[in-house]
Amino acid sequence: MEFDTIAAISTALGEGAIAIVRVSGDDAVEKVNRIFKGKDLTEVPSHTIHYGHIVDLDTNQVIEEVMVSIMRAPRTFTRENIVEINCHGGLVSVNKVLQLILAQGVRLAEPGEFTKRAFLNGRIDLSQAEAVMDLIRAKTDRAMNVAINQMEGRLSKLIGRLRQDILETLAHVEVNIDYPEYDDVEEMTHNILIEKATHVRAEIAKILETSKQGKILREGIATAIIGRPNVGKSSLLNSLVQEKKAIVTDIAGTTRDVIEEYVNVRGVPLKLIDTAGIRETEDVVERIGVERSKEMMSQADLVLVVVNYSEALTNEDEDLFRAVQGKDFIVIVNKTDLPQAIDMERVIELAAGNRIITTSLIEEQGIDELETAIADLFFEGTIDSADVTYVSNARHIGLLTQAGKTIGDAIEAIENGVPIDMVQIDLTRTWEILGEITGDTVHESLIDQLFSQFCLGK
């Protein structure tokens, strides 16, 4: 597939030690060579790096001192010729280098266009392309490992095997329909068809079993910290984040809005949401914060309910416990450095079997136990299994769920005695749906939409 030559700054904008301008296309080397003073880049071997200068052809002025990497097709990320110009990391100089390249007839790349070309040129499939962004956005080592496994094609291989199983079954059905008179063709009975379709459904279900943990690793656990004012919610946020993100005072109602922060807890990304203290108030601004707190609580995957060890439970505390019933929650009894006034038996009753952690945040006690409880609640020690291929992308999960339903419809049709040639429709649809994950049967509009979410230069 032939494309024009594109270029973009591939490193984050801002001051830094190094910035990289990436150029990809059939004539990428020739275009860069025009403005490069040093070795003749058109004559150098592939996968080599060369020192020189970028020169403004109009003024013959040296613009930058650079190192230029030459990578020739097809052994490149895009399977096109790629040139990467390593500049100093100043905003002015790197933008000037980019402008000089564009002046040679090179087009500014769209967001994600380098990865899109890698997909369109067959270097990677669609699930691997999506994993590139997952790797960039990974917030923990475990999330990074999930993305790398997907980039290496683990999910693609699983999907490929399933599609091959369906394809072989479809071919067997076709032969039975078109050549029923041939004695050397194995008859595709309803029992054989059910066995093959059931195997595919079981494999899809097995992959989907990892989706909850995979999605958490990719997107994080939305965790709301709730409680009455001044029970230690902001102190808990600061302790988990290990820096002062929220203002902590003895004045009730200090936190008036929702504060969000990502934190790595035992390899699990937590999207921590410190909410305004929930209480009845006449303060208009605080009341808005309280309403937002209730909204965040309802949307959270996990709720940390904070109560005060040195105060008796109030009606507001008990209302909070009732509000979180049916959700995953952990109770934090804070301020254990102060004399006890809380009824712990009542706390145990309200917790209804959920974990209770006692903390003294001012003395930094109880945080390790809380972090362990959070990790155990969602992963139960299974997350470290190197053999598990996690499915974490919402698009993939939706397609797998859809494929599972379609193959289920096929099984139901077979069991009801529907003719085999009619069952073929559901089998074909399942094969197509699974192909959308890897991009084998995907619409061009979806491809454009997916790659538009990438950052510029990737």
Swiss-Prot record:
A GO term from the CC aspect: cytosol
UniProt binding sites for K(+): N230, T249, I251, T254
Major subcellular site: cytoplasm
Protein keywords: Cytoplasm, GTP-binding, Hydrolase, Magnesium, Metal-binding, Nucleotide-binding, Potassium, tRNA processing
Domain of life: Bacteria
EC code(s) of this entry: 3.6.-.-
PROSITE patterns: G_TRME
InterPro entries (alphabetical): G_TrmE, GTP-bd, GTP-bd_TrmE_N, GTPase_MnmE, MnmE_dom2, MnmE_helical, P-loop_NTPase, Small_GTP-bd
Gene3D superfamilies listed in its UniProt record: P-loop containing nucleotide triphosphate hydrolases (3.40.50.300), Probable tRNA modification gtpase trme, domain 1 (3.30.1360.120), tRNA modification GTPase MnmE domain 2 (1.20.120.430)
Binding positions for Mg(2+) per the UniProt entry: S234, T255
SUPFAM superfamilies on file: P-loop containing nucleoside triphosphate hydrolases, TrmE connector domain
Note on cofactor: Binds 1 potassium ion per subunit.
Record keyword Magnesium present: yes
GO biological process, one term: tRNA methylation
Binding site for GTP: 230-235, 249-255, 274-277
CDD domains, per the entry: trmE, TrmE_N
Cell compartment(s), UniProt: Cytoplasm
Entry GO MF terms: GTP binding; GTPase activity; metal ion binding
Cofactor(s) the protein requires to work: K(+)
Binding residue positions for (6S)-5-formyl-5,6,7,8-tetrahydrofolate: R22, E84, R123, K458
One family name in Pfam for this protein: MnmE_helical
Residues of the TrmE-type G domain: 220-379
Quaternary structure and partners: Homodimer. Heterotetramer of two MnmE and two MnmG subunits.
Biological function: Exhibits a very high intrinsic GTPase hydrolysis rate. Involved in the addition of a carboxymethylaminomethyl (cmnm) group at the wobble position (U34) of certain tRNAs, forming tRNA-cmnm(5)s(2)U34.
Membership in a protein family: Belongs to the TRAFAC class TrmE-Era-EngA-EngB-Septin-like GTPase superfamily. TrmE GTPase family.
Protein name according to UniProt: tRNA modification GTPase MnmE
Organism of derivation: Bacillus cereus (strain ATCC 10987 / NRS 248)
Lineage: Bacteria, Bacillati, Bacillota, Bacilli, Bacillales
